[in-house]
Design a protein with these regions (language model features):
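Short, charge/polar-rich alpha-helical segments
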Residues: 1-13
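Non-transmembrane amphipathic alpha-helical segments
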Residues: 12-26, 45
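Amphipathic alpha-helical binding modules
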Residues: 66-102
Length: 102
């Protein structure tokens, strides 16, 4: 990974951190619209970050550790309160992991 890509990725992480702080700031607000917009922005930036990490990591498996750190930092609360609908395809994938790889 060259220096430009590194700094670009670090900038994305900083931007996600700023959005996360705005989410905390607006979590008790009466406006679900603001909260929803920040959540969407955080998710878009997160998707972009993961894509950038995967495409610029020179196929190093250590990038998965960095992604894990990112998820634990910025999505830990969401993961701890996660409940899939029974018909959700993600629930089916989760079930396969639990049944076969736990």
């Amino acid at each position: 990974m060259n220096d430009n890509k590194l700094y670009h990725i670090l900038d994305i992480i900083e931007e996600i951190n700023k959005v996360d702080k705005m989410l905390v700031l607006h979590k008790d607000s009466n406006s679900d619209l603001m909260s929803s917009q920040y959540k969407n922005q955080k998710l878009k930036l997160s998707n972009y970050l993961v894509k950038e990490l995967l495409t610029n990591s020179d196929n190093r498996t250590e990038v998965m550790y960095i992604i894990k750190l990112f998820i634990e930092k910025f999505y830990n609360k969401e993961i701890n309160h996660l409940q899939f609908e029974e018909n959700d395809n993600l629930k089916k994938i989760e079930d396969v992991f639990i049944e076969n790889y736990a």
